[in-house]
From Swiss-Prot:
Encoding gene (name): miaB
Organism per entry: Shewanella woodyi (strain ATCC 51908 / MS32)
Residues bound to [4Fe-4S] cluster 1: 12, 49, 83
Protein's name in the database: tRNA-2-methylthio-N(6)-dimethylallyladenosine synthase
Record bears the keyword Chaperone: no
Catalytic activities: N(6)-dimethylallyladenosine(37) in tRNA + (sulfur carrier)-SH + AH2 + 2 S-adenosyl-L-methionine = 2-methylsulfanyl-N(6)-dimethylallyladenosine(37) in tRNA + (sulfur carrier)-H + 5'-deoxyadenosine + L-methionine + A + S-adenosyl-L-homocysteine + 2 H(+)
Domain of life assignment: Bacteria
Family: Belongs to the methylthiotransferase family. MiaB subfamily.
Single GO molecular function: metal ion binding
One Gene Ontology cellular component: cytosol
Coiled coil: none
Length: 474
């Protein structure tokens, strides 16, 4: 009988991606199968996130529950990974004696060897090092789980915003080689994946090495991926305004596979607070990016992250944020009350905005974003939207569920044969968290793009050398 693995994941999409790779590794090298029930597992893995307040205590509460399982089964192996493990590994081991292994985001590829060591009776293992891109060299071939897939193109961040722990828990920016990224996506496309979401803490800082020792920019990578046969929808997250350059905006103008939706975190609309956060840009520069984007792609929708109650945030600072929200007309946001992260520069600042003020401002901001999102949804009434069908509807398994380019869930009635493909639906009703549609046509009635080689795409974009001679670089 195969052994069983249970993984509990907290945090961002990068953590979700990492957890899927842990499962693949444990299956490929150890023969473990996933289980949803911790009580059935031989190995329990907790993939942690350090972004939210009291992240460390949340870890210990979960480990306390798992300790009871280990008391009943001394052979049970418990591991802690992710950003809290990277930041607080020794503290976890000292406080939770039930933990057998602790590993960071950059060492999850060593998981099978760590398990071998524990199964052989070895001592607890702690490995929270930063071995650069080695992690991706050791991962097994990707396995598709539905028509949409995440693909990590880089790790870490080198921006060192004053509030953020990512550079300390995931290391500085390291890009995967171009060929590795393209191969993984091509393998997923062969398994039926139609939509790819490129992942990284700061994807637009991507600088991947090519086979001929050149550097591939993020804009060039987008065009390469869009040219892969079978990939008809392309997303990416997350990006930083200071590296959202014109060449990336140009991709929106000529690459229909790239969706009309962008998550571009701004955090605050106050120049004073942005400076305190060490974001490297002002509010007007952010708005300039959005204006140029909407010139290239008029129907693009934008979402953002906001931190409420950063140290020193005055009422005027908050009003500046609300003014930015009004000017940009965000479609969605991830908004958080500020809480100091240990070891960050901002943690040395006085947390002088009261909790009641933070909660009040958060409610005001979220209400405004919700109103704007509902207005966008209502504008879709009567329109025909192309959606990627993900599977049965959550509330009614006799119906289907898909997503628009702007990530809105649409429920509709149609033949299950359409799961995994694109369909056109007319939007007939709008709800707070979803849309209702009527099926119009399936993929066999659509005029989808013809297959193109990557060189066909890139050859359209000229480059001038230092002498001013125009070259076309395939």
């Amino acid at each position: 009988m195969s052994k069983k693995l249970h993984i509990k994941t907290w945090g961002c999409q990068m953590n979700e991606y990492d957890s899927s790779k842990m499962a693949d590794l444990m299956d490929e090298y150890k023969g473990y199968t996933l289980t949803e029930e911790a009580e059935e597992a031989d190995v329990l893995l907790l993939n942690t996130c350090s972004i939210r307040e009291k992240a460390q205590e949340k870890v210990f509460h979960q480990l306390g529950r798992w300790k009871k399982l280990k008391d009943k089964n001394p052979n049970l192996i418990i591991g802690v990974g992710g950003c809290v493990a990277s930041q607080e590994g020794k503290v976890i081991k000292d406080r939770a004696q039930c933990v057998d292994l602790i590993f960071g985001p950059q060492t999850l590829h060593r998981l099978p060897e760590m398990i071998d060591q524990i199964e052989a009776g070895g001592k607890a293992v702690i490995d929270v090092s930063f071995p650069e891109i080695e992690k991706f060299d050791r991962l097994p071939e990707p396995r598709a789980d539905g028509p949409s897939a995440f693909v990590s193109i880089m790790e870490g961040c080198s921006k060192y915003c004053s509030f953020c722990v990512v550079p300390y828990t995931r290391g500085e920016e390291v890009s995967r080689p171009l060929d590795d990224v393209i191969l993984e996506i091509a393998q997923l496309a062969e398994q039926g994946v139609r939509e790819v979401n490129l992942l990284g803490q700061n994807v637009n800082a991507y600088r991947g090495a090519t086979h001929d020792d050149e550097i591939c920019t993020f804009a060039e990578l987008l065009r390469y991926v869009a040219a892969i046969d079978g990939i008809d929808r392309l997303r990416f997250t997350t990006s930083h305004p200071i590296e959202f350059t014109q060449d990336i905006i140009d991709v929106y103008e000529d690459t229909p596979e790239l969706v009309s939706f962008l998550h571009l975190p701004v955090q605050s609309g106050s120049d004073r607070i942005l400076t305190q956060m060490k974001r490297g840009h002002m509010a007007i520069e952010y708005k300039s990016i959005i204006r140029r984007l909407r010139k290239a792609r008029p129907d693009i929708q934008v979402s953002s992250d906001f931190i409420i109650g950063f140290p020193g945030e005055s009422k005027q600072d908050f009003e500046d944020t609300m003014k930015l929200i009004e000017d940009v007309q965000f479609d969605h946001s991830f908004s958080f009350i500020y809480s100091a992260r240990p070891g960050t520069p901002a943690s040395d600042l006085p947390d002088d905005v009261t909790l009641d003020e933070k909660k009040e401002r958060l409610a005001i901001l979220q209400d405004r974003i919700t109103q704007q999102a509902m207005r966008y949804s209502r504008q879709m009434l009567g329109t025909v939207q192309r959606i990627l069908v993900e599977g049965p509807s959550v509330k009614n398994p006799m119906e289907l569920r898909g997503r628009t380019e702007t990530s809105r869930v649409v429920n509709f009635e149609a033949d299950p044969k359409h799961i995994g493909s694109f369909v056109d639906v007319e939007i007939v009703d709008v709800y707070t968290n979803s849309l209702r549609g009527n099926f119009i046509r399936g993929e066999d009635e659509m005029d989808l793009r013809r297959s193109l080689r990557p060189s066909d795409i890139l050859a359209k974009h000229k480059k001038d050398d230092e002498l001013g001679v125009t070259q076309y670089i395939p």
